[in-house]
């Protein structure tokens, strides 16, 4: 019995730790299928040995925690989890239990299980009053100011409900394209999110709502808590209520009559799953008749009238051929598994992340091992472990590299970090090249035509050895055009124009482009806005820097150390000499010049194609001066589509729907810029 109790305690400890990682850190260390398998093992043991089952067991309490960063709010009605079904038999048992209750179910409603962060939103006087995360199910975090930045969530509902307190629940998520864009924008030294679910949860818990707005969260709503107070009798009718009040509701929600139809829907969801722009990890099945919910009842953790069917994890095995090491622009060493190519979730996988050496050591991963691969949140290929039964007899443990794969400098670990680093930040070829690649990238100085391949060729030809050399390429024109770079005169001219245009960038883009550790695009803009000039920033002290919103001690020290380095001071001086702007340029530079066109006011716009200024700047103009709404997709409700060069399918859809089209040249002429 002692062994049984010890095993139960071990499983509880694991699940509590994993819950903390998932709900608080937004950074789970194990995939869903491992968590689910461990939970099932715990439940089975507790059922067989009920004397060891406690009220604080993860099998009993709702998973989740309440962060101390936000005000704690008690839910008026507990926000419970859902029990899981993993196969048809589980669903049939769920149905049989409901049928045994001898009530009219009025069928089932089948919904996609969105992989995000659960939220409850309260409306008073028909206005959004408060938004609360699920937390531990009893208490949640007040994230109202962050929720107000999400465009999918209406700030007001129909005035006829002003005498009611309306509570709706749903899931905040991040679409795939927004997830990729956000991760691209993160500083390399920042920890990138593994999947959209972690990104959505981490973003919604940010203390800076400007970051929340910038990262473009979305939300599907799926439950009207007090539907019966409004005279609504079925869950499917409540879904229509949400649609009528401008909440975003999934188009995949269907009503069926029997559990066999539910099972058929699983196949439908499986077929469309890979085509969706957002993550789903299963489907949710709810009894349609709201009037029987209380009769069917609840456990301390789950409602009995609903269940979640979890998609099985697709784990495949392949041979580890090689572990590849690389160095990034900050000197960070990465470990990547090269595997025998294998099909996983519709795409051929040849590489998977290994994070760092500690991960390899913990999993005891060796060359030629048969390793298990899965996609974390259906996005990034990850290594799940090793099939030890297939390990070769002569295999040996993998040893960490000692020297930089580029310059052979001895690697170090700073301040007990898990990552190894190359400290030869001025002499390492790969670091220097990666710095230049980052500097010219779209989210930094946006120098078009300077591809990674061209940068490598120019570096090897001694044309560019550092960032400042980019601004002297014009004098090498004849050599470049007559050498084996395969660059024609027009392409070179466009490249030089793009380099010259980059000199006009506002200070925050230059600051971002320097790639200073812990200083990403968001913080760079706040710092630039605060200090206005490079000179003022270079002379800022620790206290002045940490007074900038979101600038912590690490970022402040990193900035001070960077500007105290003579190499960097020399770089700033060189850039200043060639005319690179060193001042903050306010977003709103059009006040004195812009013409306000009355017919554009309070309209709905969609932007497509390329322009001489960024889409964000155009969006700012439309919202600031015209009080317009800017949407991502064209519909019958769109008033205007603003068209630049290389416009895509949005233009074609606008033509089909008869939406008014504004060409870029007319737009520039109308607005006097």
Swiss-Prot record:
Active site: which residues? Answer: 113
What is the E.C. number?
A: 6.5.1.2
The domain of life is Bacteria
The residue stretches assigned to a coiled coil in this entry are none
Cofactor(s) the protein needs: Mg(2+); Mn(2+)
Residues involved in NAD(+) binding: 32-36, 81-82, 111, 134, 171, 286, 310
The alphabetized UniProt keywords are: DNA damage, DNA repair, DNA replication, Ligase, Magnesium, Manganese, Metal-binding, NAD, Zinc
Binding-site positions, Zn(2+): 404, 407, 422, 428
**Catalysed transformations (reactions):** NAD(+) + (deoxyribonucleotide)n-3'-hydroxyl + 5'-phospho-(deoxyribonucleotide)m = (deoxyribonucleotide)n+m + AMP + beta-nicotinamide D-nucleotide
Q: Which GO terms describe its molecular function?
A: DNA ligase (NAD+) activity; metal ion binding
* SUPFAM superfamilies associated with the record: BRCT domain, DNA ligase/mRNA capping enzyme, catalytic domain, Nucleic acid-binding proteins, RuvA domain 2-like
GO CC, alphabetical = cytosol
* Gene3D superfamilies per the UniProt record, alphabetical: 5' to 3' exonuclease, C-terminal subdomain, 6.20.10.30, BRCT domain, DNA ligase/mRNA capping enzyme, Helix hairpin bin, Nucleic acid-binding proteins
Q: Which GO terms describe its biological process?
A: DNA repair; DNA replication
Tell me which residues make up the BRCT domain: 595-673
Member of which family? Belongs to the NAD-dependent DNA ligase family. LigA subfamily.
Question: Could you tell me what this protein does?
Answer: DNA ligase that catalyzes the formation of phosphodiester linkages between 5'-phosphoryl and 3'-hydroxyl groups in double-stranded DNA using NAD as a coenzyme and as the energy source for the reaction. It is essential for DNA replication and repair of damaged DNA.
Official protein name in the record: DNA ligase
Q: Which organism is it from?
A: Ureaplasma parvum serovar 3 (strain ATCC 700970)
Its gene name is ligA
């Amino acid at each position: 019995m002692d062994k049984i109790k010890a095993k139960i305690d071990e499983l509880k400890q694991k699940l509590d730790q994993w819950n903390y990682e998932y709900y608080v850190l937004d950074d789970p260390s194990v995939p869903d299928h491992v968590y689910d398998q461990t939970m099932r093992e715990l439940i089975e043991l507790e059922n067989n040995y009920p004397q060891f089952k406690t009220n604080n067991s993860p099998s009993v309490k709702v998973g989740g925690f309440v962060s101390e960063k936000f005000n704690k709010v008690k839910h008026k009605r507990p926000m419970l989890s859902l029990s899981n079904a993993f196969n048809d038999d589980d669903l049939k048992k769920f149905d049989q239990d409901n049928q045994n209750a001898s009530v009219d179910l009025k069928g089932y409603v089948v919904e996609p299980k969105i992989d995000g962060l659960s939220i409850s939103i309260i409306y008073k006087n028909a206005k959004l009053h408060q938004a609360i995360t699920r937390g531990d199910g009893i208490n949640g975090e007040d994230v109202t100011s962050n929720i107000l930045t999400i465009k999918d969530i209406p700030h007001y509902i129909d005035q006829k409900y002003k005498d009611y307190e309306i509570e709706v629940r749903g899931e905040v998520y991040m679409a795939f394209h927004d997830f990729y864009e956000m991760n691209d924008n993160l500083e390399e030294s920042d920890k990138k999110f593994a999947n959209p679910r972690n990104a959505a949860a981490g973003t919604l818990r940010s203390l800076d709502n400007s970051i929340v707005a910038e990262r473009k969260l979305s939300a599907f709503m799926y439950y009207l808590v007090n539907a019966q107070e409004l005279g609504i009798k079925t869950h499917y009718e409540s879904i229509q209520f949400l649609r009528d009040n401008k909440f975003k509701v999934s188009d995949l929600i269907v009503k069926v009559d029997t559990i066999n139809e539910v099972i058929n829907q699983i196949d439908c969801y499986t077929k469309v799953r890979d085509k969706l722009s957002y993550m789903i990890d299963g489907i949710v099945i709810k009894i349609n008749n709201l009037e029987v919910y209380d009769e069917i009842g609840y456990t301390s953790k789950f409602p009995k009238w609903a269940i979640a069917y979890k998609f099985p994890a697709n784990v495949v095995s392949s041979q580890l051929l090689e572990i590849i090491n690389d160095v990034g622009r900050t000197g960070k060493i990465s470990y990547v598994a090269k595997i025998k190519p294998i099909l996983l979730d519709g795409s051929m996988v040849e590489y998977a992340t290994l994070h760092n050496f500690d991960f390899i050591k913990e999993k005891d991963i060796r060359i030629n091992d048969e390793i298990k691969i899965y996609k974390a949140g259906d996005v990034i290929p990850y290594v799940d472990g090793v099939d030890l039964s297939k390990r070769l007899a002569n295999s040996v443990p993998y040893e960490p590299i000692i020297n930089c794969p580029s310059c052979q400098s001895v690697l170090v670990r700073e301040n007990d970090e898990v990552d190894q680093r190359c400290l030869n930040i001025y002499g390492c070829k790969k670091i220097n090249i990666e710095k230049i690649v980052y500097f010219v990238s779209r989210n930094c100085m946006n120098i078009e035509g300077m591809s990674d391949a061209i940068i490598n060729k120019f570096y090897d030809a001694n044309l560019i050895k550092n960032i400042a050399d980019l601004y002297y390429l014009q004098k090498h024109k004849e050599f470049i055009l007559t050498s084996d770079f395969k660059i024609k005169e027009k392409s070179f001219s466009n490249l030089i124009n793009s380099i010259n245009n980059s000199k006009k960038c506002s200070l925050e883009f230059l600051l971002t482009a320097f790639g200073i550790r812990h200083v990403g695009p968001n913080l760079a803009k706040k710092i630039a806005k605060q200090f206005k000039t490079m000179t003022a920033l270079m002379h800022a002290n620790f206290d002045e820097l940490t007074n900038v919103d979101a600038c912590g001690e690490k970022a402040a020290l990193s900035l001070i150390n960077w500007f105290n380095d003579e190499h960097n001071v020399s770089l700033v001086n060189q850039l200043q000499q060639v005319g690179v702007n060193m001042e903050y340029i306010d977003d709103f530079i059009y006040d004195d010049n812009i013409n306000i066109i009355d017919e554009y006011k309070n309209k709905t716009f969609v932007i497509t194609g390329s322009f001489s200024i960024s889409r964000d700047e155009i969006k700012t103009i439309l919202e600031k001066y015209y009080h317009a709404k800017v949407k991502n997709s064209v519909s019958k409700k769109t008033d205007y589509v603003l068209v630049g060069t290389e416009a895509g399918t949005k233009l074609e859809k606008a033509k089909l729907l008869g939406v008014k089209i504004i060409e870029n040249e007319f737009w520039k002429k109308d607005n006097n810029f």
